[in-house]
Amino acid sequence: MQMAPQMGYDRAITVFSPDGRLFQVEYAREAVKRGTTAVGIKAADGVVLLVDKRITSRLVEAESIEKIFQIDDHIGAATSGLVADARSLVDRARVEAQVNRVSYDELIGVEVISKKICDHKQTYTQYGGVRPYGTALLIAGVDDNKPRLFETDPSGALLEYKATAIGAGRNAVVEVFEADYREDMNIDAAILLGMDALYKAAEGKFDAGTLEVGVVSLEDKKFRKLGPEEVENYVHQILEKHKGNENKE
């Protein structure tokens, strides 16, 4: 009988615990922590998104797993957490971008679209009969000739970063970024840094077939995903680097 009050605030999204916590939101964050590792890095000449898709079966077609999405011409998003929840939020972001284009005849701002997604997420933390989104998004793009990178949390919180990560390998990736990130690095250097961080987070268990890379450059302000040959080239550089380090040891 003593457990009944606890079960109430543990299960209900609208009920705070005595110490001010919303457990369902915290559980949604745990879903993100169990997800694939996604990385975002701002460079001097653009912004980069990378995801290790973590394919667990050789029977799965790698191309069928998508973790980096185009939101608008100048905006991309990387996801971690529940795949279906992420797809729903990506679809909503695309609609918001198109509505802004039709209504105002201009591209939506990266911060604006990020806030709209966070506002939507936040509503799912305060109404009965719903659950929080079990996914986080890294939203990257170019605003006013500046690279922008935002993280959206399941609670609806929004933070802008120079470099960050979401998913299972977040701690390992952030440790690399804190040691090696530089604001003056270019897109190529940012991609290599992101891959190096993913390599360490995955303990060396990755290859070009499991990686997705998206970039938005200041030069053309267009989002694009790197092709397999481009990804393979960067992966080769990382593997050669670590092979050389092992030989030195």
Swiss-Prot record:
Entry protein name? Proteasome subunit alpha
Location in the cell reads: Cytoplasm
As for family, the record states:
Belongs to the peptidase T1A family.
UniProt main location, coarse: cytoplasm
Q: How does it assemble?
A: The 20S proteasome core is composed of 14 alpha and 14 beta subunits that assemble into four stacked heptameric rings, resulting in a barrel-shaped structure. The two inner rings, each composed of seven catalytic beta subunits, are sandwiched by two outer rings, each composed of seven alpha subunits. The catalytic chamber with the active sites is on the inside of the barrel. Has a gated structure, the ends of the cylinder being occluded by the N-termini of the alpha-subunits. Is capped at one or both ends by the proteasome regulatory ATPase, PAN.
What role does this protein play?
A: Component of the proteasome core, a large protease complex with broad specificity involved in protein degradation.
Q: Per UniProt, what is one GO molecular function of this protein?
A: threonine-type endopeptidase activity
**What would be one Gene Ontology cellular-component term for the protein?**
proteasome core complex, alpha-subunit complex
The scientific name of the source species is: Methanosarcina mazei (strain ATCC BAA-159 / DSM 3647 / Goe1 / Go1 / JCM 11833 / OCM 88) (Methanosarcina frisia)
Output the HAMAP family linked to this UniProt entry.
Proteasome_A_A
